[in-house]
Regions:
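N-terminal active-site segment of His-dependent metallophosphoesterases
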Residues: 1-63
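Extended active-site neighborhood of metal-dependent phosphoesterases/phosphodiesterases
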Residues: 58-161
Length: 162
Protein backbone atom coordinates (compact mmCIF):
# COMPACT_ATOMS: atom_id res chain seq x y z
CA UNK A 1 0.00 0.00 0.00
CA UNK A 2 1.21 3.45 -0.84
CA UNK A 3 0.56 6.36 1.50
CA UNK A 4 -2.86 6.29 3.17
CA UNK A 5 -4.53 9.70 3.65
CA UNK A 6 -7.10 10.08 6.39
CA UNK A 7 -9.22 13.22 6.73
CA UNK A 8 -11.08 13.77 9.99
CA UNK A 9 -13.77 16.30 10.81
CA UNK A 10 -16.77 16.75 13.06
CA UNK A 11 -19.54 19.08 14.19
CA UNK A 12 -20.92 19.92 10.75
CA UNK A 13 -24.25 20.94 12.32
CA UNK A 14 -25.70 20.56 8.84
CA UNK A 15 -29.32 21.65 9.22
CA UNK A 16 -28.73 24.40 11.78
CA UNK A 17 -25.85 25.93 9.80
CA UNK A 18 -27.91 25.86 6.62
CA UNK A 19 -30.90 27.40 8.39
CA UNK A 20 -29.03 30.07 10.39
CA UNK A 21 -26.01 30.85 8.21
CA UNK A 22 -27.08 29.66 4.74
CA UNK A 23 -23.93 27.53 4.77
CA UNK A 24 -23.52 23.95 3.56
CA UNK A 25 -21.20 22.99 6.38
CA UNK A 26 -20.67 19.42 5.16
CA UNK A 27 -20.87 19.85 1.38
CA UNK A 28 -18.56 22.90 1.31
CA UNK A 29 -15.57 21.14 2.95
CA UNK A 30 -16.13 18.09 0.73
CA UNK A 31 -16.02 20.34 -2.36
CA UNK A 32 -12.96 22.14 -0.96
CA UNK A 33 -11.19 18.83 -0.33
CA UNK A 34 -11.71 17.94 -3.99
CA UNK A 35 -10.38 21.32 -5.18
CA UNK A 36 -13.72 22.42 -6.63
CA UNK A 37 -13.78 25.81 -4.87
CA UNK A 38 -11.29 28.58 -4.15
CA UNK A 39 -9.47 26.26 -1.72
CA UNK A 40 -6.77 23.87 -2.94
CA UNK A 41 -7.84 20.24 -2.86
CA UNK A 42 -5.99 17.48 -1.05
CA UNK A 43 -5.75 13.73 -1.34
CA UNK A 44 -7.81 11.59 1.00
CA UNK A 45 -8.72 7.95 1.04
CA UNK A 46 -11.12 8.02 3.99
CA UNK A 47 -13.08 10.81 5.67
CA UNK A 48 -13.97 10.21 9.31
CA UNK A 49 -16.86 12.38 10.47
CA UNK A 50 -16.68 12.19 14.24
CA UNK A 51 -20.18 13.24 15.26
CA UNK A 52 -22.61 16.11 15.61
CA UNK A 53 -23.73 16.00 12.01
CA UNK A 54 -26.87 17.61 13.44
CA UNK A 55 -26.49 20.80 15.44
CA UNK A 56 -30.01 21.08 16.79
CA UNK A 57 -30.88 21.15 20.46
CA UNK A 58 -33.85 18.97 19.53
CA UNK A 59 -33.68 15.49 18.00
CA UNK A 60 -33.03 15.53 14.24
CA UNK A 61 -35.81 14.52 11.87
CA UNK A 62 -36.25 13.15 8.33
CA UNK A 63 -35.78 16.57 6.72
CA UNK A 64 -32.46 16.96 8.53
CA UNK A 65 -31.40 13.47 7.45
CA UNK A 66 -32.25 14.04 3.81
CA UNK A 67 -30.18 17.23 3.86
CA UNK A 68 -27.21 15.37 5.35
CA UNK A 69 -27.43 12.73 2.61
CA UNK A 70 -27.67 15.45 -0.06
CA UNK A 71 -24.58 17.19 1.28
CA UNK A 72 -22.54 13.97 1.50
CA UNK A 73 -23.33 13.43 -2.16
CA UNK A 74 -21.62 16.72 -3.06
CA UNK A 75 -18.53 14.55 -3.53
CA UNK A 76 -17.64 13.97 -7.17
CA UNK A 77 -14.21 12.37 -6.80
CA UNK A 78 -15.06 10.16 -3.82
CA UNK A 79 -17.79 7.68 -2.99
CA UNK A 80 -20.10 8.01 0.01
CA UNK A 81 -18.67 4.70 1.19
CA UNK A 82 -15.27 6.37 1.74
CA UNK A 83 -16.90 8.40 4.51
CA UNK A 84 -17.26 6.77 7.94
CA UNK A 85 -19.43 8.26 10.69
CA UNK A 86 -19.81 8.41 14.45
CA UNK A 87 -22.87 9.65 16.34
CA UNK A 88 -22.40 12.70 18.54
CA UNK A 89 -24.59 14.05 21.32
CA UNK A 90 -26.52 16.33 18.91
CA UNK A 91 -27.35 13.31 16.75
CA UNK A 92 -29.29 11.69 19.61
CA UNK A 93 -32.91 10.71 20.00
CA UNK A 94 -35.42 11.11 22.81
CA UNK A 95 -36.37 8.33 25.25
CA UNK A 96 -39.67 7.74 23.40
CA UNK A 97 -37.93 7.18 20.04
CA UNK A 98 -36.07 4.14 18.72
CA UNK A 99 -32.47 4.54 19.89
CA UNK A 100 -30.51 6.61 17.39
CA UNK A 101 -32.95 5.84 14.55
CA UNK A 102 -31.87 9.00 12.70
CA UNK A 103 -28.15 8.20 12.80
CA UNK A 104 -28.72 4.58 11.82
CA UNK A 105 -30.97 5.54 8.90
CA UNK A 106 -29.15 8.51 7.36
CA UNK A 107 -25.49 8.13 8.40
CA UNK A 108 -25.68 4.34 8.38
CA UNK A 109 -22.15 3.13 9.14
CA UNK A 110 -23.19 -0.50 8.63
CA UNK A 111 -24.95 0.09 5.31
CA UNK A 112 -28.24 -1.33 6.60
CA UNK A 113 -30.41 1.52 5.27
CA UNK A 114 -28.96 2.06 1.80
CA UNK A 115 -32.29 3.32 0.46
CA UNK A 116 -32.08 6.31 2.84
CA UNK A 117 -28.33 6.83 3.30
CA UNK A 118 -26.90 5.83 -0.05
CA UNK A 119 -24.26 3.74 1.76
CA UNK A 120 -23.71 0.40 0.03
CA UNK A 121 -21.64 -1.80 2.35
CA UNK A 122 -20.27 -3.79 -0.61
CA UNK A 123 -18.68 -0.57 -1.91
CA UNK A 124 -16.76 0.26 1.29
CA UNK A 125 -13.03 0.38 0.48
CA UNK A 126 -12.45 -0.89 4.02
CA UNK A 127 -15.38 -3.06 5.14
CA UNK A 128 -16.71 -2.47 8.64
CA UNK A 129 -17.39 -5.04 11.33
CA UNK A 130 -19.34 -4.51 14.53
CA UNK A 131 -22.52 -2.56 15.20
CA UNK A 132 -23.70 0.95 14.35
CA UNK A 133 -22.44 2.41 17.66
CA UNK A 134 -19.09 0.60 17.78
CA UNK A 135 -17.42 -0.71 14.70
CA UNK A 136 -13.97 -1.13 13.22
CA UNK A 137 -12.23 -1.35 9.89
CA UNK A 138 -8.67 -2.20 8.90
CA UNK A 139 -6.31 -0.31 6.64
CA UNK A 140 -3.08 -2.22 6.16
CA UNK A 141 -1.80 -2.97 9.65
CA UNK A 142 -3.93 -0.27 11.32
CA UNK A 143 -7.25 -1.10 12.97
CA UNK A 144 -9.52 1.97 13.19
CA UNK A 145 -11.98 1.79 16.11
CA UNK A 146 -15.13 3.91 15.92
CA UNK A 147 -17.07 4.47 19.18
CA UNK A 148 -20.23 6.60 19.09
CA UNK A 149 -22.01 8.61 21.76
CA UNK A 150 -25.09 6.44 22.50
CA UNK A 151 -27.27 9.08 24.22
CA UNK A 152 -29.98 6.46 24.88
CA UNK A 153 -31.80 8.40 27.57
CA UNK A 154 -32.31 11.56 25.57
CA UNK A 155 -30.71 14.94 26.18
CA UNK A 156 -28.82 15.41 29.45
CA UNK A 157 -30.32 17.77 32.02
CA UNK A 158 -28.27 20.67 30.66
CA UNK A 159 -30.03 20.27 27.31
CA UNK A 160 -33.47 19.33 28.58
CA UNK A 161 -36.07 19.94 25.89
CA UNK A 162 -38.54 22.70 26.73
Amino acid sequence: MEQFNLWAGSCSHVHTDLERLDRESLADPIRQSEGRTDAPGFDWDVFLHLGDTSGSQRPPNEEHGEEVVRQFHAAEDHRREQMYNLAGNHDGTTPDQETQWWFKRYLDPMGEHTEHSGVDPAERPYPVEGTWERYAFEVGNVRVLMLSDRNDGGPPDGRRMV
